[in-house]
Design a protein with these regions (language model features):
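N-terminal Rossmann-like NAD(P) cofactor-binding subdomain of oxidoreductases
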Residues: 1-151
Length: 151
């Protein structure tokens, strides 16, 4: 990222859970990314993030506290990059719909981790594996893509 550039808008799926809160804490003040959207269950949709979550990660970042939560639906989320903290029971289907809708999904779930066309990336070790995204997009017909971590 170029120094002085505007941080990219990102969304957090599963934002009210412990992993979602960790993503928010780690991204607070990040020079490349700005948490612009928080998404979780239907129960949290329409509520201010501060009211929808029981924050456990220290101080809730003020710029996220006032965000209005949405559902985990690509029609409700406009950010081009999505950090997914969804439980594996729902992550596979939801993350796939976001990738098909043109979003880059950075997933913490196991669902796509062993797929041969999905990069499992440890940035300090194998960032070059991101090149698999081209294969993934061609094979799956997605405009976006999914990248997993080793968790």
């Amino acid at each position: 990222m170029i120094s002085g550039a505007t941080p990219m808008r990102v969304a957090i799926l599963g934002a009210t859970g412990a992993v979602g809160q960790t993503f928010i804490r780690l991204l607070a003040g990040h020079p490349w990314f700005r948490v612009a959207e928080v998404a979780a269950s239907e129960r949290s949709a329409g509520k201010r993030y501060a009211d929808a979550t029981r924050w456990i990660e220290g101080d809730l970042p003020a710029d996220v506290a006032g965000l209005t939560g949405t559902t985990c639906d690509p029609r409700a989320v406009s950010s081009p990059i999505v950090f997914s903290a969804l439980d594996s029971e729902v992550a596979g289907e939801v993350e796939g719909t976001f990738a098909a809708a043109g979003r880059l999904v950075l997933s913490n779930a196991k669902n796509y981790r062993m797929e041969p066309d999905v990069p499992l990336v440890i940035p300090e070790v194998n960032a070059a594996h991101l090149a698999l995204l081209d294969t993934q997009r061609a094979r799956r017909g997605w405009a976006g893509g999914i990248v997993t971590n080793a968790n």
